[in-house]
């Protein structure tokens, strides 16, 4: 039996580093938070090769005395708490005394620090072991340089993401910290290029402009509220400025970025049903009595335990509701200025070229895209909330459509209304149709859920829809039959399936027809989004979006695909947002994602079809890759056999 023994200090530091230091972004977070706790008003972060080669954080804080440097790199040595009372009244971002020891255990670290006296101190550590300490010259403050991260833990190094992804994680964490501390001037540079600089003047809206762009900042609303326990201040976007994920929601508690599902839900509740299943851009800064907050529950302190959470949630919801009360919902989603020259951007209406440019690209494209800022995991509660929101919106839309149908056209279309030439379309054989039409490529999608009223044999035949005889139309649904079976067709889902197949086929064959612009459109992005999209320009071109890097977090669009319908600027923004929030990591999956999103946007309303149009829809469904569902998995066709109908009416009992 193995004997119990005490682990060495170096080994315990490496174990602790496994919890605290996960990647280069973790190093940046810990060092910047230390600088904030040292009362710094200016902090500069520089990384080389996405932090994999070197990370440097310099501040003008209080510095460390020469005789305290060794203690600073010892585990559980800190200046921030003294006793148990301090542990439950934490007013600093750090308090465990693990950060520097954990970093030094897995990297080469050099520190240059001064308290403002005549002599500064320089020291170096590697693998948790001190290499040297000497006097040096430096202004007041501290500069810590971390190199060769995980050099002695190759397994950890192996599982890091690509340099691009690791850089985006650093950008994300610096953005969050900057939003939580507008009073501090923060600079982030990568390989000598400045990615972010905040002024440190305490103006939160100016920081939002620096991080997310000026146009976003202009559409942010101030929220304020307080009660005896909490003070709330922040900015939330207008209801018509949304994103596809929660990544643009930042909740800061006593200056610390946290993840809290209930508080995020309270923010969404303040919008009511205005978001349409999407998410706002928001920065909520909450000040609370430290006694109400327990931050000692998670290694990275992103998750906290909060007393009176329900009271705080109500405070947030009411503040957001009040801020949105006077919002003009008729305002446009995005106001983009056309490009005139590189020194002047005038607000002019863009004109479209009358000609359609055929741009065919023979070269195949493959691009790895990773999801970087992982959103909070969706729980059953999240899915339930989103489903309820979508169902309410659909019910409201259906009521309006039914009202329009009653006043504009009969709900039922009888076959007697179909012309003789349409009867030919209805009755021509499957083989004959295949010869006359160009079938679209089969959809190699994932496994889909079966309809509750279809048999296993039906599921095996899912890729083939028989030639149906149209019976009629009611409320946007088609009724048809084949060999005694009744088929119910949701025309919106069916049209979306056909639209999806058509768009995907053109994308996969790289046969995008493009509409050119006389004046390029300017799109501004946050630092995070810009860095991600800049590497996806080849993919955007394959999608039919001719965009070029214009610098300063800006892209120019010269043309767009003709399958993109509706208001161009809005549709392009939504498409780019979908790409940014996607977790897909290969080009083919992203093409399917884009095609599905475009089909959903292009087909959104039920309409009354003529007999010929309804018959043509049924005929085209026979060539669909999966006629029974649209790309999102929503049922398009349901078959009811005579046996199913008998069961519904409980015959035979």
Curated annotation (Swiss-Prot):
Keyword DNA repair on entry: yes
Annotated GO biological process: mismatch repair
Record keywords, A-Z: DNA damage, DNA repair
Superkingdom as given in the UniProt entry: Bacteria
PROSITE patterns (alphabetical): DNA_MISMATCH_REPAIR_1
Basic and acidic residues: compositionally biased ranges: 375-408
GO molecular function: ATP binding; ATP hydrolysis activity; ATP-dependent DNA damage sensor activity; mismatched DNA binding
One GO CC annotation: mismatch repair complex
Region (Disordered): 368-413
CDD domains: HATPase_MutL-MLH-PMS-like, MutL_Trans
Signal sequence interval, chain numbering: none
InterPro entries: DNA_mismatch_repair_CS, DNA_mismatch_repair_MutL, DNA_mismatch_S5_2-like, HATPase_C_sf, MutL/Mlh/PMS, MutL/Mlh/Pms-like, MutL_C, MutL_C_dimsub
Keyword DNA damage carried by entry: yes
Pfam families: DNA_mis_repair, HATPase_c_3, MutL_C
Spans through the membrane: none
HAMAP family (UniProt xref): DNA_mis_repair
Family listed: Belongs to the DNA mismatch repair MutL/HexB family.
Function per UniProt: This protein is involved in the repair of mismatches in DNA. It is required for dam-dependent methyl-directed DNA mismatch repair. May act as a 'molecular matchmaker', a protein that promotes the formation of a stable complex between two or more DNA-binding proteins in an ATP-dependent manner without itself being part of a final effector complex.
The name this protein goes by in its record: DNA mismatch repair protein MutL
Species of the source: Lactobacillus delbrueckii subsp. bulgaricus (strain ATCC 11842 / DSM 20081 / BCRC 10696 / JCM 1002 / NBRC 13953 / NCIMB 11778 / NCTC 12712 / WDCM 00102 / Lb 14)
Phylogenetic placement of the source organism: Bacteria, Bacillati, Bacillota, Bacilli, Lactobacillales
